[in-house]
Each structure stands twice: as C-alpha cells, then as structure tokens.
C-alpha cells in the first residue's frame, strides 16, 4: 500500500484516492518572467516522478500544473525589457517547455494559465463575498477576511495572533485585519486589467490557483503539490479560499518538496549562487540532472555542487555500463528467475512516500548482479538488464541506448566518432607492435579530451566522460 507524507497531518498516511483507480493532482507551476532555475526543475521532476509512479500502479492520473502569467514580477520585467507582457510570458513559457522536455518531464494533462481563467476567478471571488469571506477594501481592492475562516493556519501550523504581532506584517489601512490578503487588485496606470463587478483590475496570485484547480479537478481532489516555500502563505490561502467558496474539504494529501541549496547555502540571487536549468544543462547531461534530483528524497534539502553533479554523472554511467553489451532476447533456462526480487524491493521503496534514493539503490544492486553474470551467464544478465531498464523507466531514467549514451557529446570533446575510432585503431597497431609508450600516449591524449577507453577480452570500447 502506497503511503504519502501528508503535510496537512504531518504524518505518512495510506493513499486512498477519492475515486477508485483514479487520481486528481494539482501542482503549482512557474511564474513566467525568467528562465527555470533548479528549484523549478526540482518541482517539475519530483511531481513527474509521482505521476509516473501512480500510473505505473495502474491508476488513471489527471495531472494539472498551472502557469502564472500575470503578476507584479511579470509586469516589472516587461517594463524593464520594453516588451509586452504577452511577448515576455510566451517566450518564457516556451523556454520552460524546452527545459522540461530536456529533463524528461512529461507534459501535464492540463496546463491552465491565469489570464485564461479570469471568469473562474471572478466567480470564486463573488462567491466568497456572498458567503462573508471577502470584502471590498477602501482602496477598491478585494480582500479575503482571514478571521472568517476558523481553520486558517492548519496547514502551516502558524499561530494567527503571533502573525498579527509580527513585525513583518505590512500594515495596509485598506484591510480590516493585517492578515487579510488580496483577491482582486484594482487597476493601476499602465498595468493590464480586466472588467469586474468591483471595478477594473487583475487577480491576486493566491486566488488564481484556487480557481484553476477547482475548475480542472473539482472542489475536492486527491493531491496538491508544490515547493516547501509555498506552504505559507500560498497554500494556506488556497485552502481558505477554496473551502470558503465551496464549503467542501479542498485537498486530501498535501505534498511539499524540500529546498534547493547551493554548496550548503540557500539558493538566492542575492548570494550570487543562483543557477538556471540552462546554465546547468550546458555542463551536464539532462539525464544526469534528473538522476541528481531523484537521488535525494523529495522532502529532503537538495544540495547542488559541482562535486555532487559529478558524482551523479559517474553513478549514472555505472548503471549504463551494466546495460552495455547485453545480448538481446536470449532465452532463460527453464525455471530461472528473471527478477530475483528486485522489482519487489523497488516497489517497497517507492510505496514508502516515493523513496527514490532507496529505489535507486535497488537499481545499483541490480547493476552489480548484471555485471556478475555478464561473462558466464549472458542470458541471465540480459534478463536482469530488461528489469533494470523497466524499473529505470518508472523514474524516467535509463531509456537511452547505452552505446548512444556513452558516445553522445555532453559538452566535452570536439572529436567526432570517426576521429576517435581512427585513434583507437592506431593504438591497436601500437599494441600489436608492443609499442606501449605510443599506446599509452594515445590513451592519455583521448582521456585529456574527455574520451575514456575500456579494454576487455572482446576489444576496446570507448565513452565520453
């Protein structure tokens, strides 16, 4: 039975979907005013893994991940760039899709945009006003009345009195309560706006997700995910809005992935340790980055460093090395087990709150077993190799042909395959002539350019670092 850590109850719970064999899941997506950074990549990869595994279990998953395409940051960036908001957001939405494709992230079933959901947003705000959960402030903005929702703070564990007393609360005289948050912002000169019963304006960030999730998945659904940084106030506000508007319990399981750290420090533009996905992909293969993300438990901090990425690259190469040179479709001897319990161990790990590090450890045990059988029992090795590829596929890994993986250029050597093969032949001639110095020179020259030679009884193979 799959168990998920529920941020709402702060414990692991057996996952029981609202409808048998069907799962509805919503994840907060990007605010598209810049390129994806590693934090965005983690959200994309983590919840792609969740959706893949639920589908692997035979469940019908409806996965919704929104796009915030109107926001204060978007407006500021468009002004700075001297371009329209539409041009800015279109460019970064396309860049986001390129990055997620590179990382092996399957597209969500629905990707609603805030600007395409204005009618739903207006309807929800109207309902909240009717039910006494929202009001029009003295400045024309519409605010959510936090005091009207007794369960506010349940997700984050925040104490309302302490929040009110906190020095960080910005005092806004238009509000009845310092904790009240904006649902509809009245129009300001030079900013985009839409007509509403409360005057022209645009939606606040929090109401967008409530409106889009309930439209796509209904008032009550199974899983809501996002980064830990969104737990408060964003997800807390979503609960207040959605339950205030519908009168129903909003979400059964709340999932939050951990923070990204750079060299043991919090990732931050102000600290100068901020990396976009594109900057990382210029140095590392996309599959290495995906492997790196999944090799930490989704709730744990993810510590980015060159050393950790290099270790991920070496580890992934070991898995591909196990798959290299396997004979396809060899029949196993009668009664021979082609799995040896690896699939069961993998499932046990994944059923325990998507424990991908433990699941990946099973893949390495499987790879060692393949290597042990390669020479003496090729049929056994091939069968185990099929299991390794199948389990890797559940995580979106190990789907490239091993030879193609090792020979693809990951941004290192400029040598062509033909150049490399020519030098390997020259090295072979040197070895035949017992010219070991020349043989070593060619090997070292290739290594300096990121080409690793591997000698065996079957001959010499090569791979790019």
Swiss-Prot record:
One of its GO terms (biological process) is cysteinyl-tRNA aminoacylation. It is found in: Cytoplasm. It catalyses: tRNA(Cys) + L-cysteine + ATP = L-cysteinyl-tRNA(Cys) + AMP + diphosphate. Its cofactor is Zn(2+). Zn(2+) binds at residues 28, 209, 234, 238. The keyword Ligase applies. InterPro entries: Cys-tRNA-ligase (IPR015803), Cys-tRNA-synt_Ia_DALR (IPR015273), Cys-tRNA/MSH_ligase (IPR024909), CysS_C (IPR056411), Rossmann-like_a/b/a_fold (IPR014729), tRNA-synt_1_cat_dom (IPR032678), tRNAsynth_Ia_anticodon-bd (IPR009080). A motif ('HIGH' region) lies at residues 30-40. Keywords: Aminoacyl-tRNA synthetase, ATP-binding, Cytoplasm, Ligase, Metal-binding, Nucleotide-binding, Protein biosynthesis, Zinc. A motif ('KMSKS' region) lies at residues 266-270. GO terms for cellular component: cytosol. Its main location: cytoplasm. Its EC number is 6.1.1.16. ATP binds at residue 269. GO terms for molecular function: ATP binding; cysteine-tRNA ligase activity; zinc ion binding. Binds 1 zinc ion per subunit. It holds the Pfam family CysS_C. Monomer. PANTHER family: CYSTEINE--TRNA LIGASE, CYTOPLASMIC (PTHR10890:SF3), CYSTEINYL-TRNA SYNTHETASE (PTHR10890). Belongs to the class-I aminoacyl-tRNA synthetase family. This is Cysteine--tRNA ligase.
């Amino acid at each position: 039975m799959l168990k998920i850590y529920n941020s709402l109850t702060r414990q692991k719970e057996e996952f029981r979907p609202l409808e048998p064999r069907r799962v509805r899941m919503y994840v907060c997506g990007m605010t598209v005013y810049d390129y994806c950074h590693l934090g965005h990549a983690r959200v994309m990869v983590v919840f792609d893994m969740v959706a893949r595994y639920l589908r692997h279990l035979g469940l019908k998953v409806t996965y919704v991940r929104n796009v915030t395409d109107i926001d204060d940051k978007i407006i500021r960036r468009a002004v700075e760039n001297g371009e329209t908001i539409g041009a800015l957001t279109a460019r970064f939405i396309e860049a986001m899709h390129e990055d997620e494709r590179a990382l092996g992230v399957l597209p969500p079933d629905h990707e609603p945009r805030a600007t395409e959901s204005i009618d739903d947003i207006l309807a929800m705000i109207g309902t909240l006003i009717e039910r006494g959960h929202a009001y029009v402030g003295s400045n024309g903005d519409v605010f959510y009345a936090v005091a009207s929702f007794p369960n506010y703070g349940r997700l984050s564990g925040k104490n309302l009195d302490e929040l009110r007393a906190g020095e960080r609360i910005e005092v806004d005289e238009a509000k009845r309560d310092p904790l009240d948050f904006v649902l509809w912002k009245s129009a300001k000169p030079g900013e985009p706006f839409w007509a509403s019963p409360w005057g022209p304006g645009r939606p606040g960030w929090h109401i967008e997700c409530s409106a889009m999730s309930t439209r796509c998945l209904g008032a009550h659904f199974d899983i809501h995910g996002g980064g830990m940084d969104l737990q408060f106030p964003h997800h807390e506000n979503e609960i207040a809005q959605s339950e205030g508007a519908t009168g129903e319990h909003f979400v059964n399981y709340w999932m939050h992935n951990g923070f990204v750290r750079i060299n043991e420090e919090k990732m931050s533009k102000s600290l100068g340790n901020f990396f976009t996905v594109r900057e990382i992909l210029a140095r590392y293969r996309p599959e290495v980055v995906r492997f790196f993300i999944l090799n930490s438990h989704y709730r744990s901090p993810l510590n980015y460093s060159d050393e950790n990425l290099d270790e991920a690259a070496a580890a992934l190469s070991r898995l591909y090395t196990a798959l290299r040179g396997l004979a396809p479709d060899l029949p196993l001897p009668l009664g021979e087990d082609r799995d040896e319990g690896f699939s069961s161990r993998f499932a046990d790990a994944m059923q325990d709150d998507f424990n991908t590090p433990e699941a990946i450890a099973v893949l390495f045990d499987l790879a060692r077993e393949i290597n042990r059988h390669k020479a003496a029992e090729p049929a056994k090795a091939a069968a185990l190799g099929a299991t390794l590829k199948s389990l890797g596929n559940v995580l979106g890994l190990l789907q490239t042909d091993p030879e193609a993986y090792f020979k693809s250029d990951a941004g290192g050597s400029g040598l062509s395959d033909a150049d490399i093969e020519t030098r390997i032949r020259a090295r072979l001639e040197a070895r035949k002539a017992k010219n070991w110095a020349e043989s070593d020179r060619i090997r070292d020259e290739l290594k300096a350019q990121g080409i690793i030679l591997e000698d065996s009884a079957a001959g010499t193979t090569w791979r790019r670092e």
